[in-house]
Structures are given as C-alpha cells and as structure tokens.
C-alpha cells in the first residue's frame, strides 16, 4: 500500500498542514469516502472541493461534510492547540505512525480487491461497502499534547492496557504489575486516560520510571475526566496525550468507541485487565483482533461482573490468559514495522462493537449510527434546538430533523416549543403526530 498523504510536489508545508486540519475537522470520522477523495485529488484539492460543494460525484462525502464545510477555521484550531501546548501531525510527515495505522485501511483494501476480481462474491463487496459507510478508518491527523518532538509511538514498542472504569482493587493491582513489567522491557504503556484500569496503568508506568501515553475521546485542550488531570498532565510530559479530535471537541459515547481503534492500532499488543460483559474495552480487543495484533486477558472470578468480558475472551479463544506479569512481556514486539493489512476481512461493524460499561441495556441498544450521534449530542436537562445539534453530531440539519422524529417515536426524546431533550423516563404511550 502506498503511504498515506502523498501529494503533488511543491505544496507549501503550511498550506498542506491547514488542508489536513480542515479534513480532520470537517467530518465526524475519517470515512472511506473521505480517503477516496484524498487519494484521488490530494488533500489540498479535496478541501477545495468540499468547501465549494463540488462533490456531485460523491454524494456520501457530501453528506458527511455538509454540516461543517463552511465553518471550519484551520488557523483557529491550530491557535487553540498551540495555547494548550499541543501540535498537529498528519499523514506524510516523518513522525506520522504510518506502520501502526495503515492496517485501519484494510476495509478499503478488501473492497478494492473484491472489485478488481470482477465478481461480487455472493454480495460480499456490497456488504463491505455498507460497513465502510460507518467505519472509522485511518485518522486524517492527530493532535498531540506534550511528548517528544518526534512521536515516540512511531518506533518504540507499545503495550495497550485497558479495562473497566469500575475497577476492583485486584484489577488496579494487576494493571499496575503489567505496566511495570512493560516498562521493564522499555515499552510504552498506552491507554485511554479513563478512571479505573486506565489510570492505574498510566500511574504505574510513571512510578516505574517508564513512559506512558494516552489517547483521548475528546480534544486534547481539556483533559477528561478532570479527576485524572494530574495523571494526564504527567503523561503529556512523558510520551504524550493524543486525540484525533480537534481542540474544543467534547465527549460522546461513539467517540470513545471510535477512539478504541486507535489504541489497538498504535499498540503492538493489547491486554484487557477487567471488563464487564458490555465493556468498551472489549471493542478495543475486537479491533486488535481485526488488525491481527496479539490480545491477552486477565482471568478473574466467575462471580465477578467485572471479569465476565475477560473470561469470555479467554473461553472463546480470542485472547490468551495472562497468569503472571512476566508473561505479558513476550507479547510486545521488540520494534515497530509493517503489519499485515490485506489478509483479513474488515472489522466487525460498529453497531456490533457498541458496548457500554454497565452490562445493562442502554438507550443506544437498537439505534443506528445516525440516531446514536444525534442522541449523544442532546442533553437530558437542557432543551436544544435542532440547529444547535449540527456541530456536535456532525450531521446536516435536515437529517437531524428526520432522526429526531424517529427518536421521538421510540420515546427516547421529548419536544417543547421547537426544542428537544432526552427523555428522563421512557414514556409508555406511543407518540405520533410529530411536526417540525
């Protein structure tokens, strides 16, 4: 596969950087349609086509970028990043983690290969194309706060340690032991900066005198959760705090799920320490498996809800059981190099990977991608007009209005004088006769 971001010679680096910033911010996720346009036109011309709505030949990308096409200011985003001590890296730069992230393009590789073979293979290409509509692929840029001048994750061995936010003392202790063992073989400990297992792994790596990095599900200008701000500040001084989301981007559930693919891709191996049956950490494990990276899980008590997910990974032969801290060191590749990326089908659909951490049914069960994005952009306490949901959901207004109607019919949102919010309790009566 050719390196991401190759473009025509003679483009000013500042112009190129602003083009990538625009592409990074204009769509909610880096889709196949976005990358097809970048590969066809180059990043600078792709930006011009999106801004001028010259996308008649690509209605999918037109829909994905319509909501933000005229509002993105790359200069302002770069300024906000600089104020937070962050920088922007993009494909084509020497510090871009090309080897690690290239496997995220596998769905497009499979689609193109099936097309070149000249057969639909019983509808397989159509299925892959449908999955590509909602899958996040290679990010179009990363915002990096702190860390060395050249991203350490590019060349150093990396171990991801992930798990539940509701960690037990056992889970926190094991996460710390695994992190210390990774540091002992000069590996960077990577996690998501969350409460529970994540912060235990970060802190243990730092305490052992090693390096740690965090991948956030929001902009790096504000650390989240605030309770972990101290740990995240130290991680920024270590290997860095990263995000694919521009400064000012807030937290939503689907951004956590999209973020998990980056943790899996940037790591040489992934260990799940504690995870409930529907833990988001399991989506990281799924991505690691789809990218053909080693997966391990820490077995736990059959009576512990926090170990149900880990025990299932081991039972189903999707992860090896870790029975001592020393065992984890054998999973970590000694160096970073090309990963296989054309030998396996696309990862499972995002809908199948949309886990919550509670182990209980959630309002997201049964919702498609558009419905989840609108629902996440809403508040349970503050009424909002449909126009206010455009930026947060990354969807055009007409689509938001349509989705609100469906959510209303399901009893998940309520309306008052043209404004909307999430229902605090789900109504039992069927709601009809909705007008905008």
Language-model-derived ranges and their functions:
Residues 1-89, 410, 414-416:
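Long amphipathic alpha-helical segments
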Residues 1-16, 28, 92-436:
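Glycine-biased, small-residue-rich flexible motifs in mid-sequence functional cores and linkers
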